[in-house]
Amino acid sequence: MENQHQKFISRRNFIKTSALLGGTAFLGTGLPNIKKTYSKELDYVGNFEYPLAKPENILYSACLQCTVACSIKVKINNGVCMKIDGNPYSAMNLGENLPYDLSPKEAVSIDGKLCPKGQAGIQHAYDPYRLRKVIKRDGPRGSGKWKTIPYDQAIDEIVNGGNIFKDIGENQNVEGLKDIFVLKDPKVAKAMADDVTKIRKKEMTVDEFKAKHKDNLDVLIDPNHPDLGPKNNQFLFQVGRIHNGRIEFTKRFVNDSFGSVNWIEKTTLCGQTSNKAWVHSTREYLEGKWTGGIKSPRPDHRNTEFLLVFGSIVFEANYGPVQETEPITEGLESGRLKIAVVDPRLTKVASKAWKWVPIKPGNDAAFALGMIRWIIENERYDTKFLQNATRLAATNSDEPSYSNATYLVKVEKDGRAAKHLRANEIGIGTEKEFVVISNGKPAAVDPENSNLAIQGELFVDTNLEGIKVKSPLQLIKEEAYSKELAEWAELSGAKQKDIEDISKEFTSHGKKAAVEFYRGAIKHTNGWYNGQALIVLNHLIGNMNWQGGISNTGGGWSYIGDKEGQPYPMANLHPNKLSKFGVPITKEGWKYEESTLFEGYPAKRPWYPFSGNVAQETWPSISDGYPYKIKAALISSHSPMYSLPGGHVQLKTLLDTEKVPLLIASDIVIGDSSQYVDYIFPDLTYLERWATPGQSHHIRVKVNQVRQPVIAPLTENATVFGEEVPISLEALMMSISEKVGLSGFGKDAFGPGKDLNRMEDFYLKLVANIASGNKQGELVKAADSEEMELFKSSHRHLPKTVYDIEKWQQTLTSDEWKRVVYVLNRGGRFASSDDAYEGSFIKKKIPGLARLYLEEIADSRNSISGNYFTGYPKYLPIMDMAENLINDEGEFHLITNKEVFGTQSRTITNYWAQLALQPENFVVLNSVDAKKLKVDNGDKVLVTSTSNPKGEHLIAADESRPTIGKVKIVEGIRPGVVAISTHYGHWGYGARDIQIDGEVVKGEEVRGLGIHPNPLFRLDDNLRGTTLSDPIGGSASYYDTRVNIQRV
């Protein structure tokens, strides 16, 4: 640890530029004192004067070392963050959390739980390679040459454009953001948006649109295709890890002020297919439409008796280890819980399991359908639950929810299952009612009719009024019965007895069993159907909303002010807001057939009507100029070159100034992708900024942790709307707004007399909404004089650029301010862990149905193949977007994983965690395969694939490095499968030398150690430069690549 610490401090010896934190006096004089301060404070313990146990040295916030955003307790001395622990007020980080009304002075001695990443977040903030100043490329894109420029100059150049690179010999007139911001009139935007909706619904023709809007057609990208939207859409904001609060701030800028539809997150690189499959499988049917749905229900681990895990590393990643480990471990220790894990790799949780089944990657649906067959054959499904066709029927049978298992589905002449049959089609009701067979006769069903209690027959295959119909459970049965159990076992790579044993155990605990799954099951081209099959397993035992079953999160108090009586309804506090409209660059949320670009099949690129934030589609679409060109892009907290499968193929697009004439990044470092842009504006780390993240999927009570600045910002300051503030993403967006003249920022941004001049003017309103509660009588207490003094003293080290108490108070009313202080003193608002249940049920329920059939999916087509999707789970092999089989000849199947101490990029700075515990990753092989290859631990091997036959990782226009890693031999992986973890093998983030203002900044070799698997992943041969993807859920494929391995 001493050596690691000395390495960390010594960075100042070769970082000479003040553009980086390591070249400043702060690092040179501040960080060595951390070591001295630690030693000094240890001496204090015996004298009971330990400064980190004083309430005035504690601030509460929210982590961002992974997506979970744990509630954290930050301990500060002399303005320096010294220690990070879990917040004991929050049920996220202390199982039996402290009473919310307990004084922070009394809570100071109690710490909550936190993982290694969270505790190492100190080094994320104090990374010597952090950017402080704006830098502009001083050579071609990707040359590694930079120069610092004044903030105001950078804003002027990106807003006004022009020949802004003439000083380095480039003669290109670049359009500035003001030139792209063409549609400015809110009334015109609203009228056009409404009419584009009509075009989409085939209620208006393009000619009619053009005639109606003839005076404003010049604002459109293409008047012959008005559904592409205005030229404003040619500005793209692509973001990676971002949380609530900051999401709304950036959407306010991109969508509502600039009027672009292109706010694109990175979710398809994470769990989007899982999210969307659960949303559609838990929707309500209201006023003739399927609506709502819950993004990621999870097992109630505190009460589950049998947990079946597919492709989820519960103790190392997921949502997240801090929340899941304790109840699972308690269950194993007490004997309450039995676990089975279906995963090619022996994960930490698999090592504790009753059964570990090393499945073939991508064949989760085969295993699940084998289970479904066994469950149906042995009648181990919950008949009563599945038969309930209305909410009243469920209530009458003491069930908290019901299903659509009996809602009849029309079967077309070609055998395709289509939409649900409606009552009007056979003359027994309306078009908003479904049909079930009840007591041998068809009956009309309105699911939410409070006077209707109907139970339907589960297995139906008949004709009604000449219409062929089947029930959803019948369709699922037919798919499950399409193969013998032995065949399902062979496909999945499991033993038939394992399927039988697990099926029996799964159906032996009533409602207290659950299937949990994540990336390993769904990051495949067939990921949607894998996920849907696993969801159906939960539905078959009717475990939704029961203790020990599948449940909703506890949620929280609304931060956006959409509840009655809340003081700041943020959606309404934006005068002259623009109406965004048009097809996003990713074609997400649109059916190809409803666009004016429809020309039959295949489409030029995939469309994703059921997904969103399709990150891997962004840059290939930009490269192809389809559906339109992007003129300016701003990237934040996202690294497409590192995080995308096959991301290196996008390098040519990033380097091409014709493809994206203006490329900007907001980043804390010169990263693996931001190194290729034109300008980098420094951003704040999570210890210096605001957000209202929301809670983990695994907590059953309300949680609203608040991210707030706990250390002084380490970026330079800038003047925005007359206020001196730290340079950040928020400051950048506000400066652009000020320069361009966008609505929603500056004077009267929220309405007359309500300005948005500092980011706190926005974020404090969110906290005020949380303090107000969701209904009357839910106000938190107002801080008394003692708490007010504590608030002031605990913030004493923060400069006025982020903490100006007078200005903070001015943005709220006096009463709101006191309640906001009460919330901030505790790091958010938290319900008691005792508030999770109502009898045998989860208190905050999933409101919708358990849907076994998804008619909206069945009614849609693959935009490349033109074939319809299927509304129920089915087994599909791995295919490209055109539905060609992928049958590569590689000897090994490549998978990837995360370690508990690592995330994609930012943990490479964590000398106390990732770099101390495991400085590099490995090519992990089973001993059987190692013998075949004649390799041993530590041997170097070259890994190649069909899409990367030479094993080259392109990192610059004329530079690549080989995909070589060190071998690690284990027994806990399926023979024929090789695993390479992520978060290693960087070439930015301080890993390589760069030049700033003529000074060479030496890179640090340890940051580049290891092998990065993403350049090896299989690309779609029909879509140049795009990874294989799930056509429904939109997920990028991380587990469908075969590789060869050669000793070097």
Curated annotation (Swiss-Prot):
Keywords annotated in UniProt: 4Fe-4S, Iron, Iron-sulfur, Metal-binding, Molybdenum, Oxidoreductase, Secreted, Signal
Gene Ontology CC: one annotated term: extracellular region
UniProt subcellular location: Secreted
Cofactor(s) required, per the database record: [4Fe-4S] cluster; Mo-bis(molybdopterin guanine dinucleotide)
Cofactor note (record): Binds 1 [4Fe-4S] cluster. Binds 1 molybdenum-bis(molybdopterin guanine dinucleotide) (Mo-bis-MGD) cofactor per subunit.
Traits of the deletion mutant: Disruption of the gene abolishes selenate reduction but does not affect nitrate and arsenate reduction. Selenite reduction is decreased, but not significantly. The mutant cannot grow with selenate as a sole electron acceptor.
Signal sequence bounds: 1-39
PTM text: Predicted to be exported by the Tat system. The position of the signal peptide cleavage has not been experimentally proven.
Annotated positions binding [4Fe-4S] cluster: C63, C66, C70, C115
SUPFAM superfamilies, per database record: ADC-like, Formate dehydrogenase/DMSO reductase, domains 1-3
EC number: 1.97.1.14
Family annotation (PROSITE patterns): 4FE4S_MOW_BIS_MGD, MOLYBDOPTERIN_PROK_1, TAT
Annotated binding of Mo-bis(molybdopterin guanine dinucleotide), by residue: C270
GO molecular function, one term: metal ion binding
The organism's place on the tree of life at top rank: Bacteria
Catalytic activity: selenite + a quinone + H2O = selenate + a quinol
Quaternary data: The complex is composed of three subunits: SrdA, SrdB and SrdC.
Role of this protein: Component of the respiratory selenate reductase complex, which catalyzes the reduction of selenate to selenite. SrdA is probably the catalytic subunit that reduces selenate.
Protein name, per record: Selenate reductase subunit A
Organism: Mesobacillus selenatarsenatis (strain DSM 18680 / JCM 14380 / FERM P-15431 / SF-1)
Lineage: Bacteria, Bacillati, Bacillota, Bacilli, Bacillales
Gene it is expressed from: srdA
